Curated annotation (Swiss-Prot):
Family of the protein in this entry: Belongs to the GTP cyclohydrolase IV family.
Alphabetical list of Gene3D superfamilies matching this protein: Urate Oxidase
Parts of the chain that traverse the membrane: none
GO molecular function: GTP cyclohydrolase I activity
GO biological process: tetrahydrofolate biosynthetic process
Taxonomic source organism: Staphylococcus saprophyticus subsp. saprophyticus (strain ATCC 15305 / DSM 20229 / NCIMB 8711 / NCTC 7292 / S-41)
Function (record text): Converts GTP to 7,8-dihydroneopterin triphosphate.
Reaction equations catalysed: GTP + H2O = 7,8-dihydroneopterin 3'-triphosphate + formate + H(+)
Designated gene of the protein: folE2
KW Hydrolase (keyword) present: yes
This protein's UniProt keywords: Hydrolase
Protein name: GTP cyclohydrolase FolE2
E.C. code: 3.5.4.16
Residues marked May be catalytically important (site): C176
Taxonomic path: Bacteria, Bacillati, Bacillota, Bacilli, Bacillales
Length: 292
């Protein structure tokens, strides 16, 4: 058995099974290597989307830096074997300035760079991140950081935007109207998870505070908002407000829809509420879709 010098890293590696590299015969210089992706011939079908998923990169959502989870794709012509996926990361890095800014204008410019770098007509992305914001307790007005989940979706074909959407998911309190109605006192309540996918009108200038407007529709129509910090006066207020505003999942999504339906910057929306029922072993949910 070969003895290795265990006082060195290389010796320990070989002791645990590492071996020396072989003398290879294939090129090691990029220009001499075969580029399979760039092969051109009839590959039978065009591909609508090909790319990468689960790319985690720093992003800026308003004034907070957080982690974004990206998927990127481009189209692929019938006569091309594949895309050069490393160029996707090169395009991302070109737009990285202490975090990729999550707004539609910045993401559009990123897609245009990707489109040009990949030499393809169509490109798209989806990116999810935590959205942090200041939240004040209802009575004592103590500030803390609240959060919701946001997902931006954007796609282009040449210079034209073909898909523009934002999804916001936030937790709220819902108090059961039936429980309140049949009980002598109190009512069961629970955390509800509300998701709104908003389809943005591509032909109208988008208002600056669109995220806040959508989140307000989601939270204000619930039995109560969730707060990071509650002192006793706040807790009293939250408890009583929930009792005064009972909501089924059906009620909540209809009320949210009523708030959103007349905005000209929206082409439509999907709304879902899922209640983590406090007196059942199952969840309750409701969904609706609306298109103009």
């Amino acid at each position: 058995m070969t003895e290795f010098d265990l006082s060195t890293r290389e010796g320990r590696w070989k002791h645990f099974g590492s071996v020396d590299p072989i003398e290879g015969t294939k090129p090691t210089i990029k220009e001499e290597m075969k580029d399979l992706q760039s092969t051109h011939k009839n590959f039978l079908f065009e591909i609508e989307e090909v790319g990468i998923k689960n790319l985690v990169y720093p992003v800026l959502v308003d004034r907070f830096q957080t982690a974004g989870n990206f998927s990127f794709s481009t189209s692929l012509n019938l006569d091309e074997k594949g895309i050069n996926m490393s160029r996707i990361l090169e395009s991302v890095e070109k737009h990285y300035h202490n975090g990729i800014e999550l707004d539609f204008d910045a993401l559009y410019q990123l897609l245009r760079s990707l489109q040009e770098r990949m030499n393809q007509n169509a490109a798209g992305l989806d990116v999810s991140a935590k959205w942090f914001f200041d939240r004040f307790s209802p009575i004592t007005q103590i500030k803390a950081v609240g959060h919701a989940d946001v997902t931006y979706g954007l796609a282009i074909d040449k210079q034209n935007v073909t898909r523009k959407e934002i999804t916001i998911e936030a937790a709220v309190t819902t108090l059961c109207p039936c429980s309140k109605e049949i009980s002598e006192y109190s009512a069961h309540n629970q955390r509800g998870i509300v998701t709104v996918k908003a389809y943005i009108n591509k032909d109208i200038e988008l208002i600056d505070n669109y995220k806040d407007v959508i989140l307000d529709a989601m939270e204000a129509n619930a039995s109560s908002i969730l707060y990071p910090i509650l002192k006793r006066p706040d807790e009293k207020s939250v408890t009583e407000r929930a009792y005064e505003n009972p909501r089924f999942v059906e009620d909540l999504i209809r009320l949210i829809a009523a708030d959103l339906v007349d905005f000209d910057w929206l082409d439509g929306f999907d709304i879902e509420c899922r209640n983590e029922e406090s007196i059942h072993q199952h969840d309750a949910f409701a969904k609706l879709k609306y298109r103009k």
